[in-house]
Amino acid sequence: MATVMELKATARPKSGKGAARAERRAGRVPGVIYGDNQPPLPISVEDKELRLRILAGRFLTTVFDVVLDGKKHRVIPRDYHLDPVKDFPIHVDFLRLGAGATIRVSVPLHLKGLESAPGVKRGGTFNIVTHTVDLEAPAESIPQFIEADVSTLDIGVSLHLSDIALPNGVKSVSREDVTLVTIVPPSGFNEEQKAAAAGAAAPAAAAAPAAKAGAAKAPAAAAKAPAAPAAKKK
């Protein structure tokens, strides 16, 4: 069950740029609640509280009860906009969640076993292809993150989304099997591998002519050998 946070809000009686600027001057961030086949609901939330929620992380995967005039609206943030200069929130959108709602979310990817992977011990380096995973999940059980065990990966081996067991009711929305992480070989690794392969092949290559020479000498020796005397008749 996902943890539900509470966020207080007030209704916005007016809309438009002028009304939004007035809300910001009053220390509030304009926003809207939409979805679930209901009309949009213009709201505003306290600037300081919204900043703290965003800075806490996982804002876009956290379910909230927005309290408005004593009534709770179950929502999830879908987007927020920051001032391009001052970097503070200037607008926030919430998606209303109906009973049994299923939504698409982008969930952080956590890796474990980084230091114990054989590829790392051999000098390889992890290349994290994606830091998030796009999933479809029930609103009441959105995973806070997806954990992937990379402790068995060797150089040149990749971990894909299909290699991970997702929680019950959660599925990937990607069309392809997403590559999550690979182990990149160290500098000069390919040359070392080629040299090792060449070194292993050298004794076999040297033994081949000797074997051929031995095979050629055997018939010649047999030809030079004197013929056995014929058996005498009694």
From Swiss-Prot:
Keyword DNA repair on entry: no
* Annotated spans, Disordered: 1-24
Q: Name one GO cellular component term.
A: cytosolic large ribosomal subunit
Q: Name one GO molecular function term.
A: 5S rRNA binding
- Gene3D superfamilies given for it? Ribosomal protein L25, beta domain, Ribosomal Protein L25, Chain P
Kindly give the Pfam families that the UniProt entry links to this protein: Ribosomal_L25p, Ribosomal_TL5_C
Q: Which SUPFAM superfamilies match?
A: Ribosomal protein L25-like (SSF50715)
Q: Which family does it belong to?
A: Belongs to the bacterial ribosomal protein bL25 family. CTC subfamily.
Could you tell me what this protein does? This is one of the proteins that binds to the 5S RNA in the ribosome where it forms part of the central protuberance.
PANTHER family the record matches: RIBOSOMAL PROTEIN L25/GLN-TRNA SYNTHETASE, ANTI-CODON-BINDING DOMAIN-CONTAINING PROTEIN (PTHR33284), RIBOSOMAL PROTEIN L25_GLN-TRNA SYNTHETASE, ANTI-CODON-BINDING DOMAIN-CONTAINING PROTEIN (PTHR33284:SF1)
Instruction: State the name under which the record lists this protein.
Output: Large ribosomal subunit protein bL25
Q: What is the lineage of its organism?
A: Bacteria, Pseudomonadati, Pseudomonadota, Alphaproteobacteria, Hyphomicrobiales
Name the encoding gene, please.
rplY
